[in-house]
């Protein structure tokens, strides 16, 4: 079946808000085995909304809209769908009671306008909103399925997964299951070359690489009569990928690098502290994303100036004068210094030129040195990271987290 996404909202059209809903829905429908050929964004204009809605209905079997279910006069998605199917909007008391309950819970008074959110096209299936005041609905008629969802991602995601996916199961031909392997430390072309025969000869399951910021993902997808059978098809392919890419595969699904490292540090009872210059606390911020990291993360120091490096970390003045702040020698002393002062098993440091200015011929923008002290033994690495200031910093942090992960695998 063909699916089309229609996102409603002037704020999306003008780029004021990033349209993450379309990305989320496209991935979900793809994982379920539906085909998608069109997406559209339309502002809060009723005539243009009607035209786009009719175009979508004529092209697709399933049309999903996001937004336009609010209480204001320009929230007209339900009205547009009801008019197309020649249906009345009917008041649904249970939904209204849930809206009232939501307002009571957050200590706010409900306005008369919010009553509008409890009106739905006659005969539709109502989708409960567990995280907001705008319930969704499904109109399933004349060989067309129209799914109306609210705009906020925090409301769409649980509504889609809890209510829409179960509803659409009857339209799936068999079961499609995907497993995502996350890879870092190797580029998309290099990883794809190592798996070339698997990619070239794929049937069921299929395997597809996707380049993302600082990493690559491989989605393995199988189609079968049941989820259990599909997973059995995926397993041999996953084994082959892992055998070839080895420790470059760091996780599955939505697992992040910091999740993996955090779990390893806790399991191995290894404490860690950070000393950052060019990354300015970004590394420690990533590490503390992992719940429970307080067991092993002792502290993070942002030592931007030479004085801070000397006073806080014990970096020698002679080192800074002879080699400069951006050097392997300084990175080594920073890592050793933070491990010593924090009393941790691991100390890690970053020092470099993030840009856009400050670079020289000898030390250009993107040059970064990182240091790693594990149980008193110090190593350093030289990195050359392309991109703007934020990109350089993000890439350095990813590289450092991955480096620590690889170093402690066999400890």
UniProtKB/Swiss-Prot annotation:
Which InterPro entries does the record cross-reference, listed alphabetically?
CinA, CinA-like_C, CinA_C, CinA_KH, Competence-induced_CinA, MoaB/Mog-like_dom_sf, MoaB/Mog_dom
Source organism's superkingdom?
Bacteria
Pfam families (UniProt xref)? CinA (PF02464), CinA_KH (PF18146), MoCF_biosynth (PF00994)
Output the SMART domains linked to this UniProt entry.
MoCF_biosynth
By sequence similarity, the record places it as follows: Belongs to the CinA family.
Q: What is this protein called?
A: Putative competence-damage inducible protein
Species per Swiss-Prot/TrEMBL record: Clostridium acetobutylicum (strain ATCC 824 / DSM 792 / JCM 1419 / IAM 19013 / LMG 5710 / NBRC 13948 / NRRL B-527 / VKM B-1787 / 2291 / W)
Q: Which gene encodes it?
A: cinA
């Amino acid at each position: 079946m063909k699916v089309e996404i229609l996102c409603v909202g002037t704020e999306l059209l003008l780029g004021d808000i990033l349209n993450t809903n379309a990305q989320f829905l496209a991935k979900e429908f793809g994982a379920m085995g539906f085909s998608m050929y069109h997406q559209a964004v339309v502002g809060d204009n009723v005539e243009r909304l009607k035209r786009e809605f009719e175009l979508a209905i004529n092209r697709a079997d399933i049309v999903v809209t996001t937004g336009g279910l609010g209480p204001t006069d320009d929230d007209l998605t339900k009205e547009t769908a009801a008019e197309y199917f020649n249906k009345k909007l009917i008041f649904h008391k249970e939904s209204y009671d849930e809206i009232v309950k939501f307002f009571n819970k957050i200590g706010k008074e409900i306005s008369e306008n919010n009553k509008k959110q409890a009106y739905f096209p006659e005969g539709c299936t109502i989708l409960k909103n567990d995280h907001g005041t705008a319930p969704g609905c499904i109109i399933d008629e004349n060989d067309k399925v129209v799914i109306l969802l609210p705009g906020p991602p925090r409301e769409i995601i649980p509504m889609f997964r809890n209510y829409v996916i179960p509803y659409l199961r009857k339209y799936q031909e068999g079961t499609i299951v995907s497993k995502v392997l996350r890879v870092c430390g190797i580029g998309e072309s290099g990883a794809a070359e190592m798996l070339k025969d698997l990619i070239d000869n794929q049937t069921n399951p299929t395997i597809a690489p996707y380049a993302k910021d600082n990493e690559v993902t491989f989605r393995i997808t199988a189609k079968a009569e049941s989820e259990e059978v599909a997973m059995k098809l995926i397993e041999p392919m996953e084994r082959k990928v892992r055998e070839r890419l080895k420790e470059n595969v760091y996780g599955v699904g939505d697992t992040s690098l910091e999740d993996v490292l955090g779990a390893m540090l806790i399991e191995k009872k290894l404490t860690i502290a950070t000393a950052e210059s060019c990354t300015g606390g970004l590394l420690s911020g990533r590490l503390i994303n992992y719940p429970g990291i307080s067991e092993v993360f002792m502290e993070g120091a942002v030592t931007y100036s030479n004085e801070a490096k000397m006073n806080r970390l014990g970096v020698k003045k002679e080192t800074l004068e002879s080699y400069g702040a951006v050097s392997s020698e300084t990175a080594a002393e920073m890592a050793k210094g933070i491990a010593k002062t924090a009393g941790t098993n691991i100390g890690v440091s970053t020092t470099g030129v993030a840009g856009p200015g400050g670079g020289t011929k000898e030390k250009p923008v993107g040059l970064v040195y990182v240091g790693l002290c594990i149980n008193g033994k110090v190593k350093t690495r030289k990195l050359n990271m392309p991109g703007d200031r934020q990109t350089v910093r993000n890439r350095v942090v990813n590289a450092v987290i991955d480096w620590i992960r690889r170093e402690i695998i066999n400890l």
